[in-house]
Amino acid sequence: MGVTCVCQVPVAEGKSVQQTVDLLHRKLEQLGAVKQGNFWVDCETYHATGNATGQPSKLLYVMHNSEAPLSCMALFEGGPGLSADANFDVLMIKLKSHFQNAKGHKVESRGTRYRYCDFLVKIGTVAMSSSARGISVEVEYCACVIPGDCWNLMKEFMQSFLGSNTPELPTVFTNKAEGLYVPVDCMDTMSQYLELFSKVRKQQVLPGSGVR
C-alpha cells in the first residue's frame, strides 16, 4: 500500500449526497480516471461493561476494509491499535461479557474505486442506520510509502477534482514522533477513517439521505 489521505467532502449547495457523489465521479472521469470496482470500510463501536476504577472506560473500535478482506483492525480510543485476522470478530462475540456492542453506532462508507496512473481514488457515501451522513474521499498514491516524499504531488492531484475542499496533510502523519519520513502502514488509513466516522456520528441527518 502507498501513502493515503482520507477526508470528508461537504455536500454541494443545492445538491443531495448522491448528486454530489455523481459530480465527483464525473470530475474524475474527465481527468481520465477509470472505474475499478467498489469498496467499503466499516466501524463498530464497543464499550467495556465493567469498570472498577470509576473512570470513564475507553471505547474500542473494530474496523474492516475491503482492501484487506481477511483482516480486522481494532483501535482503542486514543490508541493503541492492532491488526488481526477475521477471527477477531468471533473473539469479540466471546468477550461480550467484557465488551458490549454499541447498537446503532455502526458507521460505514461504500462507493466506487477509481484508478488514475499511480493514484487509487475511492469516493464513498458515509452512512449510519441506513441514513447518509456525508461523503468520504480516499486518495492513495501507490508509488510511495513516505508521506514527506509525495505529499505535494498528492495535494496537487486532489486539487484537480476537489478544488477548495482539498485537505491539509493528515494529522496521523504530522503527529508521529519520527516525522514525515517513516513508512506508512494500514493503521494510518484506518485512523483517518475513524476520525472521519467520529465526526459524522455527531452530524444531523442530511436531507434526502436515504442510502440506495
From Swiss-Prot:
Keywords linked to the UniProt accession: Activator, Nucleus, Transcription, Transcription regulation
UniProt keyword Nucleus, yes or no: yes
Primary location class: nucleus
GO CC annotation: mediator complex
InterPro entries with a match to the protein in the record: Mediator_Med20
One family name in Pfam for this protein: Med20
GO molecular function, one term: transcription coactivator activity
Entry annotated with the keyword Nucleus: yes
Compartment annotation: Nucleus
GO biological process: regulation of transcription by RNA polymerase II
Family (UniProt): Belongs to the Mediator complex subunit 20 family.
Assembly and interaction partners: Component of the Mediator complex.
Function: Component of the Mediator complex, a coactivator involved in the regulated transcription of nearly all RNA polymerase II-dependent genes. Mediator functions as a bridge to convey information from gene-specific regulatory proteins to the basal RNA polymerase II transcription machinery. Mediator is recruited to promoters by direct interactions with regulatory proteins and serves as a scaffold for the assembly of a functional preinitiation complex with RNA polymerase II and the general transcription factors.
Protein name according to UniProt: Mediator of RNA polymerase II transcription subunit 20
Organism in which the protein naturally occurs: Danio rerio (Zebrafish)
